């Protein structure tokens, strides 16, 4: 009698393998054979679950987003809106090996989005989700009187997005990556310049 296969478990194994490999090696260094081997299965088994590398990339992106999204939702629960915003922005930094891996994954996603409509759609959705999250936090701070009534919420959110992207590029591509402390200082200075939020004391 054929062994019963738990399709959900096997699919998760493939997505976890793809996510792990892309974080380490980038998209160009990942093959269907490599993903299958990392997951402990054959390439033939993999093609039963995804039809192409682009489909695998899209699915792996959603897999990757789960933990990131959960951590950011938790940070949003901070009662102080500005500190919630600071916490969310800190989480987005390429400040440790795991987060640098996430950014390596996302940069590969950017590159692939130029050539693939499905990947491009997911990239746009991720940015839309990110913009909404930051706007929501800045609006909360504005509604609670923590920042000036003249602050343009959307413009401030977009400037924060641009800063985070720029920091990540410097970390991964400049050859002179800013330290975690420097990355956080840049966030603190942005909050002071754009929102009038005083920089927190060290520690």
Task: Show where each model-derived region lies.
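N-terminal intrinsically disordered/low-complexity leader segments
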Residues: 1-9, 199-203
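Helix-turn-helix
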Residues: 13, 17-59
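Hydrophobic alpha-helical connector segments
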Residues: 59, 73-103, 153-160, 184, ...
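Short, basic, alpha-helical segments at the C-terminal edge of helix-turn-helix-like DNA-binding modules
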Residues: 62-68
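Helix-loop "lid/cap" segments that line or gate small-molecule binding pockets
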Residues: 75, 90-97, 104-115, 189-194
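C-terminal peripheral helix-coil segments that are non-catalytic and often amphipathic
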Residues: 87-94, 131-132, 136-140, 163, ...
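Amphipathic alpha-helical packing segments from all-alpha helical-bundle domains
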Residues: 98-107, 117-144, 155, 185
